[in-house]
UniProtKB/Swiss-Prot annotation:
<keyword id="KW-1104">Inhibition of host RNA polymerase II by virus</keyword>
<keyword id="KW-0946">Virion</keyword>
<dbReference type="InterPro" id="IPR049114">
    <property type="entry name" value="Flu_PB2_6th"/>
</dbReference>
<dbReference type="GO" id="GO:0039523">
    <property type="term" value="P:symbiont-mediated suppression of host mRNA transcription via inhibition of RNA polymerase II activity"/>
</dbReference>
<dbReference type="GO" id="GO:0075526">
    <property type="term" value="P:cap snatching"/>
</dbReference>
<dbReference type="Pfam" id="PF00604">
    <property type="entry name" value="Flu_PB2_5th"/>
</dbReference>
<dbReference type="InterPro" id="IPR049106">
    <property type="entry name" value="Flu_PB2_N"/>
</dbReference>
<dbReference type="GO" id="GO:0044423">
    <property type="term" value="C:virion component"/>
</dbReference>
<dbReference type="GO" id="GO:0042025">
    <property type="term" value="C:host cell nucleus"/>
</dbReference>
<dbReference type="GO" id="GO:0039694">
    <property type="term" value="P:viral RNA genome replication"/>
</dbReference>
<keyword id="KW-0506">mRNA capping</keyword>
<dbReference type="Pfam" id="PF20951">
    <property type="entry name" value="Flu_PB2_6th"/>
</dbReference>
<keyword id="KW-1262">Eukaryotic host gene expression shutoff by virus</keyword>
<dbReference type="InterPro" id="IPR049113">
    <property type="entry name" value="PB2_helical"/>
</dbReference>
<feature type="site" description="Avian adaptation">
    <location>
        <position position="627"/>
    </location>
</feature>
<dbReference type="GO" id="GO:0003723">
    <property type="term" value="F:RNA binding"/>
</dbReference>
<dbReference type="Pfam" id="PF20948">
    <property type="entry name" value="Flu_PB2_2nd"/>
</dbReference>
Amino acid sequence: MERIKELRDLMSQPRTREILTKTTVDHMAIIKKYTSGRQEKNPALRMKWMMAMKYPITADKRIMEMIPERNEQGQTLWSKTNDAGSDRVMVSPLAVTWWNRNGPTTSTVHYPKVYKTYFEKVERLKHGTFGPVHFRNQVKIRRRVDINPGHADLSAKEAQDVIMEVVFPNEVGARILTSESQLTITKEKKEELQDCKIAPLMVAYMLERELVRKTRFLPVAGGTSSVYIEVLHLTQGTCWEQMYTPGGEVRNDDVDQSLIIAARNIVRRATVSADPLASLLEMCHSTQIGGIRMVEILRQNPREEQAVDICKAAMGLRISSSFSFGGFTFKRTSGSSVKKEEEVLTGNLQTLKIRVHEGYEEFTMVGRRATAILRKATRRLIQLIVSGRDEQSIAEAIIVAMVFSQEDCMIKAVRGDLNFVNRANQRLNPMHQLLRHFQKDAKVLFQNWGIEPIDNVMGMIGILPDMTPSTEMSLRGVRVSKMGVDEYSSTERVVVSIDRFLRVRDQRGNVLLSPEEVSETQGTEKLTITYSSSMMWEINGPESVLVNTYQWIIRNWETVKIQWSQDPTILYNKMEFEPFQSLVPKAARAQYSGFVRTLFQQMRDVLGTFDTVQIINLLPFAAAPPEQSRMQFSSLTVNVRGSGMRILVRGNSPVFNYNKATKRLTVLGKDAGALTEDPDEGTAGVESAVLRGIPILGKEDKRYGPALSINELSNLAKGEKANVLIGQGDVVLVMKRKRDSSILTDSQTATKRIRMAIN
């Protein structure tokens, strides 16, 4: 206090004021503070002070030739005095204006290319439509959103390598461009920016905007795709919102949206196959989204969605540590629990085995249309604070929280038996059984839960069992809040494991995700999704299955042909023929298969009856488990276009039509490709690779006796050589391998050697 009084006294004396305002600062410490180092200590003051001077800018001497000494108004643009301590000219800010108006112009061709993101933004805003402003309370929740429309999805490191390669190609330093997108972008940008005069540093900054996803954790009440986020300040305030429709879409939003659709389709399809994990991986690896491999998008795209995260987990990528239940993302914010198996009885006296979480825990729950804070103890809901867009969304969140709490009154509210199954007809686990049950009808659950009187707390109201708001009473422990609950902000990713049924667990064994959590919502993808996997042929209906099956046979005819003659069983069991079976009438499958297999066997036995077109036509029918019978067919039926259509055993039909002249096959009128008999070889026939383990040595050698047929080769001893008749009557020398280890490469070498041996 003493010091303050003393200061007050000092300040009341005019001399003190004079010293502080009029005299110069000559204390060494202060001078040091403001002059040491290159860093400006008070930039705003420095700027004001500089701009108050007549010549605050220095420029190279060449400026004197490029700018007149005075402008049209007769104001001086530069001073003849040199800048103290350097060889530069002092220049007035008016010179900048003169330069901007009268200075040299350069080509503007590169501007739209370098400042692409800005030009595109202007276009989007120009074509966007702004609707009316509504005044209402905004329930905003913080979500991690993409703030940079129109970017590729490279990691910072990948982008850095691309930028260095494009902007500073001659700089030293190791740059590794590995991913497809890196290489494509680098090539494209190098071409676009040839002879670009814009400062390299600027180009680098702008490239970064184009290549890297930038996310921020922002309060949002509405659309979260980047074209909405760029106008967030125009569309939502604290108590108002303005309707807005973007004037264009950007690829990154389309990729996010299409990725989710592809992932959902793939997870749903994998669930019903014999080995879900293997199928899922096969589909992810063979799918393209907008022309880019799905696995590459998964590696780069940080989108968090249940199906996308299951695909990432299968690929061994890290995912967020939050878990999913009932379509809500749960993140534990405090507390802990141990899991114990317990048997409980439903209201229908059905026994359920559930894993009970023992202990006090707090969670945030975030869904698309509602969010909540949940506090629970062992099988008891202590408090649930919900906020949502409407009554329906709030009810969804309450049901999920009540089931998750594992309370006894919830289990006792079950009426009837629980026997929900997933797509593969397997029973769901007990927690999902309960969830599905109450999602269908939650009346009993809400009625049995119990209600309590409530205190008047700012911003919170009660909700009754019929989901109407109330200020007096509320469902026990449940309150509705005006404020939303923020999404989990951390971008931390954890290592997870996945089992063959696609259940994803963290390292402690907690289930984070399972196929039950994948949304059933169907949407239309913005980018073309190309599923090359036969498992996804069904997605576009029976016609697509038919066309794809025949296309596959034609594309792989070389290998199919060899397997047909040597290893038919392996061929018949190929998964590519699975979807086709659903088109064949159930009652006829086994008979058709037996008939076609017998026909094929006769072709193999009787030389010269090999008929390529007929084999292709009938092959898919041979894939079903056969039934041996004497039945003969002249046509086989497939169910497409809502009725049975016939495929003739010999000759063309509306379903299968081969044009000998053009060598093209049309299936249901759609082109299914051209049948090129071994385009590279021109000679090798069915046996182009002869047999695995029997490599071709070269041209025929008479010393090894007359030519054998392919089928006689199996009698050769290891190391024995023989001449063999292959394809179109050509004879080559072969030898049976002594070891089996290098068998894999045989078929590749064989193809090359046949060429050499025959030419």
